[in-house]
Curated annotation (Swiss-Prot):
The keyword Disulfide bond applies. It is found in: Secreted. This is Bone morphogenetic protein 15. Gene3D superfamilies: Cystine-knot cytokines.
């Protein structure tokens, strides 16, 4: 009889809370029907998809790699945590190297290469927000000193030279004095990015011998196209992904209210029926065995991923372990289902398993990696580091 009374009170509590939910279904409150997909779930599988496999080309070297390493260290700490004061302005940056280059016959003191950059606009979850070309405006070689610039083969393309010390109005850029950067966002977005299939950005890299060197015959011998120019593409989350994160935060607020309401119902039921076999933490063992977060570190070398992940070297995913007590603590933010499941296990049917200790909140992680085609990618992956635990 006491058990039936407890369950009856709990069911009435659920009904009352659902009525409160209906009243809250007004502007300013996220609809629970839209909260099915939680975008903060761990994305380690998304990271694994980036693995280039054995067909990966040679490990990048030289200035492009140094550029991306400096960009990474400005945007993330040594553990891969995105810095709060980062100025990169994007969740993902891809360094694209030329897929082909053609040396043109010299015209007087001018020496020209054409560089082709492949563009794949299949980033469904991301939108292109910025595109720049970084190139060497000075070439100091043995017996040669050249001044260089780039031109696009895109009609009516507007470009904007960026100061060597900046990458935008107030964003520092990891550039040396011999390199400069131009903004070609308009060219890419308006002329090339929305085309079906693959597009190619073609640039002319033009260098002029300085006075006094014209008599010597200049050749591009020993210089790769990546030594003179590369393309940077900046991406951000689409509106749908941002909206999904806002909805997820609203879901957490609702879950906290639900858990608090149901836990009060449990205590009220037990106080009314004092002779009932109420759930108690006294039988749940040591407090040290309760569900909690445990630190853990692993290197990408141990995972076999160090041949394509440049930085960081270590990964601290953490893990959740412990007993989900019969009365779930409020601080665990357990959902209604876990609270009811725990009560059913204790009071009604022991064959129903108790909730499991699993991660609840996650932190993102910034990773610098090499793609199959040799491009270098900086990307912030959501849900990589467990920050807290819950019972579900």
């Amino acid at each position: 009889m006491a058990l039936l009374t407890i369950l009856r009170i709990l069911l009435w509590g659920v009904v009352l809370f659902m009525e409160q939910r209906v009243q809250m279904a007004k502007p300013g409150w996220p609809s629970t029907a839209l909260l099915a997909d939680d975008p903060t779930l761990p994305s380690i599988l998304d990271l694994a998809k980036e693995a280039p496999g054995k067909e990966m080309k040679q490990w990048p070297q030289g200035y492009p790699l140094r550029y991306m390493l400096k960009l990474y260290h400005r945007s993330a700490d040594p553990h891969g945590h995105p810095r709060e004061n980062r100025t990169i302005g994007a969740k993902m940056v891809r360094l694209v190297k030329p897929s082909a280059n053609t040396v043109r016959p010299p015209r007087g003191s001018w020496h020209v290469q054409t560089l082709d950059f492949p563009l794949a606009s299949n980033q469904v979850a991301y939108e292109l927000i910025r595109a720049t070309v970084v190139y060497r405006h000075q070439l100091h070689l043995v017996n040669y000193h050249l001044s260089c610039h780039v031109e696009t083969w895109v009609p009516k393309c507007r470009t904007k030279h960026l100061p060597s010390s900046k990458s935008g109005s107030s964003k520092p850029s990891p550039m040396s004095k011999a390199w400069t950067e131009i903004d070609i966002t308009h060219c890419i977005q308006q002329k090339l990015w929305n085309r079906k299939g693959r597009s190619v950005l073609r640039l002319r890299f033009m260098c002029q011998q300085q006075k006094g060197n014209e008599t010597r015959e200049f050749r591009w011998h020993g210089m790769t196209s990546l030594d003179v120019a590369f393309l940077l593409l900046y991406f951000n989350d689409t509106d749908d992904r941002v909206q999904g994160k806002l909805l997820a935060r609203g879901q957490e607020e609702l879950t906290d209210r639900e858990s608090s309401f149901l836990m009060r119902s449990v205590r009220q039921a037990c106080s009314i029926e004092s002779d009932a076999s109420c759930p108690s933490q006294e039988h749940d063992g040591s407090v040290n065995n309760q569900c909690s977060l445990h630190p853990y570190k692993v290197s990408f070398h141990q995972l076999g991923w160090d041949h394509w992940i440049i930085a960081p070297r270590l990964y601290t995913p953490n893990y959740c372990k412990g007993i989900c007590t019969r009365v779930l603590p409020y601080g665990l933010n357990s959902p209604n289902h876990a609270i009811i499941q725990s009560l059913v296990n204790e009071l009604v049917n022991h064959s129903v398993p108790q909730p499991s200790c699993v991660p609840y909140n996650f932190l993102p992680m910034s990773i610098l990696l090499i793609e199959t085609n040799g491009s270098i990618l900086y990307k912030e992956y959501e849900g990589m580091i467990a920050q807290s635990c819950t019972c579900r």
